Amino acid sequence: DADADADDSIVASDLAEERQSEIYDPVKFEELALPEPLLNAITELGFEECTPIQGRALPFSLSDYDVTGQAQTGTGKTAAFLITLFTRFWENPLQQRPNLGTPRALVLAPTRELALQIEGDAQGLNRFMDVRTVCVVGGMDFDRQRADLLQGPVDILVATPGRLIDFLDRRDINLGAVECLVIDEA
């Protein structure tokens, strides 16, 4: 039902920078229902308040709504979707780990540089949790990425489209258990 799908989707968009301070009432991370280990990592990274895009998106994404976000580079969009993924995995642990190469979340990024940055941000948030992130991108050693992918269960797979196709063609990745899809810079 198209109407039901529309009810489960939210659009979070930042306004012009000069207007943000006039209308945005900052949300503190501690006000959100985040797992304590994740909140500790956010605090250690030096963050107390959500950016405007995070403050608008997180209340919905943490409540299991689909969210489309648009904001300038460097405004915290990556942290918003990673915080959502980490929280989801904490609140919904798997009873049985999936087969190797079967991620719970897929994050598609258009470039190697962005994919590697997303992986680095995920590692920063993962200080006190056990969320396994693997990054597969073109222009880097395929066999090394394959070994990393098949080393153990994957929670978050960050990939560029071309390299994802390479792994799908070889049947090293199974997207059948993906719970969350993030398309960054769509």
Could you say what each language-model-derived stretch is?
Residues 8-10:
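Eukaryotic nuclear low-complexity, Arg/Ser/Gly/Pro-rich intrinsically disordered regions
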Residues 2-4, 15-186:
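SF2 DExD/H RNA helicase N-terminal ATP-binding lobe
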